[in-house]
Amino acid sequence: KASSQKYTAPLVDTPRSVTVIPQQVIKDTNALSLQDALRTVPGITFGAGEGGNPQGDRPFIRGFDAQGDTYLDGVRDTGAQTREIFAIESVEVAKGPNSAIGGRGAAGGTINLVSKRAHLGNSLDGAWTWGSDQTQRYTFDGNYQFSDTVAGRLNLMTHESNVAGRDKVNYDRWGIAPSLAFGLGTPTRVNLDYYHLESDDLPDSGIPYTIPTGGSGARTSADPSKPYAGGDHDNFYGLTGRDFRKSRVDIATFAIEHDLTDSLTIKNTLRHGNSMQDYILTQPDDSKGNVNNGSVWRRANTRVGNTATTTNQTDLFGEFYLGGLKNSFSTGIELSREESERSSYNVDTNTKGSSPTTCTPSLIGANSDYNCTSLSNPNPDDPWNGAISRNYAGTDTKSNTRALYVFDTLELSPEWLLNMGLRYDHFDTQYRTYDASGATVVNSKGVASKSRDTSEFVTGQLGLVWKPAENGSIYVSYATSATPPGALLGEGMEGNPLGNTTDRTGNLLSSDMEPEETTNYEIGTKWDLLDQRLSLAAALFRTEKENARVQVDTTSYENVGETRVQGIELSASGKLTDKWQVFAGYTYMQARQIDGGPLGKA
């Protein structure tokens, strides 16, 4: 069964594809980060910092960007970051549109991290890792029962490593996650959890791409852009004296749960989280074709980002009978406020060439103030001493969410189950733009550069399950999701697609953007075999997105077009014997753009 009470049936009877990565698989694969763990799940790929994205986790589920669809114990975890795994018990990946469970977004699915929490009993676990490239990692996981109803748990981690096959790059981080539980084994239970993670890295943007001599417009299948490092893929084109990436995450959670009766429970979860990301990293840029003459421009990508989130969820769940039919239900309300501030640095990267970004062999080194380096033999320790200053030009985005939801699994008979879910969201987001000094930008009519959007949407899920045997099921399901403008608070590839237009008198006009709408159709089967030691699943799916939002120029977005992803997924997981464990999967996907919109902009 999934950890969230919103799943009202065991996974074998849940009409959607759900993959659970248990603690044993995390240990067996030596996963050190969320990305490591998710690489064991079919249907997930990863992006990087393309298109101005912040550094951090950027998973794609079934081809759809899921950067903003990560949850911690069922609560949205906003803010770009690279997530650790030391305080995580398991990872749950639900595939297909999942807004009914998670709220806005979730076009391809959701990722839920289940925390290590205090429990009854005493346990002690520790691990250390020494490896190549100066890798050192130490973890501690201790649980202690103070009394019949009170327990505490502490998780610690420190990690230092360089990167195999890359010069100079290093990643250093440490974290602590204490947990206290009261009332264990009683009708009223309280959990207090805290999570802190800090990192200090020398980041890596990889190697440059070659551009044909005729420029990017001259690219063909025979002469494409392709990565090229001058013969040595260990080459690092950054600067050890300039580049850095620092991040910090703090999350505090207070949860209280009370059994009203043997079949009815109420739970409230209050959480506040802050995440910070601060970096300057070198992108080996070839926008001017510098690689063709053996040189590379050290472009600087920068970001200063802070995200704060406060969320309160109240859930009522349990079982009841109506007309002689059993209902397993969950209903609740969610209130949240999220704020994201984003700015950057000014970095002097002028090469002193024919243009500020042009490099030639004669400009490599001191003649360009070390903003040009050699393609085949870069020196990361160049004595770069250019100017760096804060640039407060950026945005402040604030969002408020109010949501109501209800889920029910209706047992029509021992062989037939009907799974239903419905959610209403009121999502209000607004942003303000600042200039380099930190002052609010105003237009020619003196109106502040800001905008807002209010979206209301209803999403749902419906599935019919047939159980030919107690240990198996065959299902058909339908699910929807909605992604309103500003859903990522400017923390992802979309930025802020809100209007900044005014009427003739300069009064601000609200955005008229509509939410993107995604629909999933799925048919599948699940079986628990070998006394529930082995779980098998197969599914055919089709996911369609309408109202796709596309950036048509530097400041404008439009709802145009339709896309479709369809495919098949197979999975197997379990413990066959005391010594043999299997965790396998396969996904085949076919993606198409069905309609590019009236102007073909999609």
Report the location of each language-model feature.
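Acidic, small-polar-rich N-terminal luminal/periplasmic segments of exported/outer-membrane proteins
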Residues: 1-121, 523
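Outer-membrane beta-barrel translocator/receptor signature
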Residues: 87-89, 100-176, 184-188, 250, ...
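Transmembrane beta-strands of outer-membrane beta-barrel proteins
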Residues: 124-126, 152-154, 190-192, 266-270, ...
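Transmembrane beta-strands of outer-membrane beta-barrel pores
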Residues: 128-134, 158-162, 196-200, 272-278, ...
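Acidic/polar loop-and-plug regions of large Gram-negative outer-membrane beta-barrel proteins
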Residues: 159-164, 171, 176-259, 274-307, ...
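Structural signature of Gram-negative outer-membrane beta-barrels, strongest in the C-terminal barrel
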Residues: 181-185, 307, 326-328, 334-338, ...
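Face-selective signature of the C-terminal outer-membrane beta-barrel domain
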Residues: 252-274, 301-433
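Gram-negative outer-membrane beta-barrel transporters
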Residues: 533-535, 539-544, 559-602
